[in-house]
Amino acid sequence: MSGAVALVLAGGSGTRMGRPKQFIELLGRPALYHTLRAFQEAREVERIYAVGEEERIRDLASGCGIDKLCGCARPGESRALSARNGLLLCGEEDGVICLIHDGSRCLVTPQLIGRVVRAVEEGADGAIPAVPVPDTIKVADGERVLKTLDRSSLRAAQTPQAFRLGLLRRVFSAPEEVLREATDDASLVERAGGEVRLVPGERTNIKLTSPEDLVLAEAILAARERRGSRL
């Protein structure tokens, strides 16, 4: 075991869904259960911390055998501010690898978790899963197309994103206005001049953002259950 820690961000209000998406049931269990279960099963992860409703998350974990959960933090006003709150729980050892993950990415697998941890162990400042962008991407001004981007160099970033704790503490000490604008953790490391390595992501590792995503996620979970595998 490498002794990595996982920080799961589960404090979203679910504005677009009309309810907190991390607690929407998929196959009879909250989406967050499926997220936590992947980190519970990942041999590289020693401890799990979460950002969100502490009582609700602890009840979920204790009722489902998630015994790696070690603490919960209150959400912040933005994703990065929530992550900063959670990092306060993760310990003072600079060399420990920390994986920051969107709680609504409930289809993450232990195999993907292992890949990002290994990339940091091999020397990268950070590692993020990413997949090629299959669609043609247009830059638009309202309804007017300004230009077409070369998709061969484009990648869609996913989570979990892995970094050493010491580096995370440094980059999350940036001013709050910088943190509010950050849409992922790697962008803060990039801003500080760090090397972020891409590892193969998984197209099934979707983020729940629309009702259609719920249908797709439940179908993928059901297929995995039939196979007896998280792959």
Curated annotation (Swiss-Prot):
Which reaction is recorded as catalysed by this protein? Answer: 2-C-methyl-D-erythritol 4-phosphate + CTP + H(+) = 4-CDP-2-C-methyl-D-erythritol + diphosphate
Q: What is its EC number?
A: 2.7.7.60
Q: What pathway is this protein said to act in by its record?
A: Isoprenoid biosynthesis; isopentenyl diphosphate biosynthesis via DXP pathway; isopentenyl diphosphate from 1-deoxy-D-xylulose 5-phosphate: step 2/6
Q: Which HAMAP family match?
A: IspD
* Name recorded for this polypeptide: 2-C-methyl-D-erythritol 4-phosphate cytidylyltransferase
According to UniProt, residues marked as the site described as Positions MEP for the nucleophilic attack are 151, 207
Q: Where is this site: Transition state stabilizer?
A: 16, 21
Function, as annotated, reads: Catalyzes the formation of 4-diphosphocytidyl-2-C-methyl-D-erythritol from CTP and 2-C-methyl-D-erythritol 4-phosphate (MEP).
